[in-house]
A protein has these predicted regions:
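Active-site beta3 strand of CheY-like receiver
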Residues: 54-61
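Receiver (REC) domain active-site loop signature in two-component systems and cognate sites
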Residues: 66
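C-terminal output helix
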Residues: 97, 115-124
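Short amphipathic alpha-helix used as the core "switch/output" element in two-component signaling
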Residues: 48, 72-83
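Two-component/phosphorelay signaling modules centered on CheY-like receiver
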Residues: 19-38
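Alpha4 helix (beta4-alpha4-beta5 surface) of REC/receiver domains from two-component response regulators
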Residues: 73, 94-109
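Helix N-cap/capping motif at the beta->alpha junctions
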Residues: 39-48, 71
Length: 132
């Protein structure tokens, strides 16, 4: 048996206004055998879900650019609601200024689209291992 922690008891929330992107990420996470996957169409919807059941989420994977509330804004709200919740930002922004802005906002992990399954698996496994 490997030393890797089981992901079967973990819950991951996917936040993206693009349904196709949510489905793609869901497919990748399903292959990783994550126990429960939830989805939110935007920041407000994600916050509502987290307020109803904050203990039931182990990781939020979120797009940066969404209408109404950006991923960086959502991250700030989540930090106030559940400070230790791991957060992974997904974005098409690859310029140095955007990376610095995300880091300055405290975003702990960042993937530039297009997302590779290997990179997603590495970051998700790392972030979830910190919650074990």
């Amino acid at each position: 048996m490997s030393g890797a922690p089981s992901l079967a008891d973990k819950t991951v929330m996917i936040v993206d206004d693009d349904q196709t992107m949510r489905m793609l990420i869901r497919r990748m996470l399903t292959r990783m055998k994550i126990g429960t996957l939830t989805e939110a169409e935007g920041g407000q919807h994600a916050l509502q879900q987290l307020e109803l059941a904050p203990a039931e989420c182990n990781l939020v994977i979120c797009d940066w650019n969404m209408p109404g509330m950006s991923g960086v804004e959502l991250f700030g709200h989540i930090r106030a609601l559940k400070p230790g919740l791991p957060f992974l930002m997904l974005t098409g922004r690859s310029d140095a200024g955007s990376v610095v802005a995300a880091r300055n906002a405290g975003v702990p992990a960042y993937i530039v689209k297009p997302i590779s399954p290997e990179e997603l698996k590495t970051k998700v496994s790392y972030l979830l291992a910190k919650t074990a």
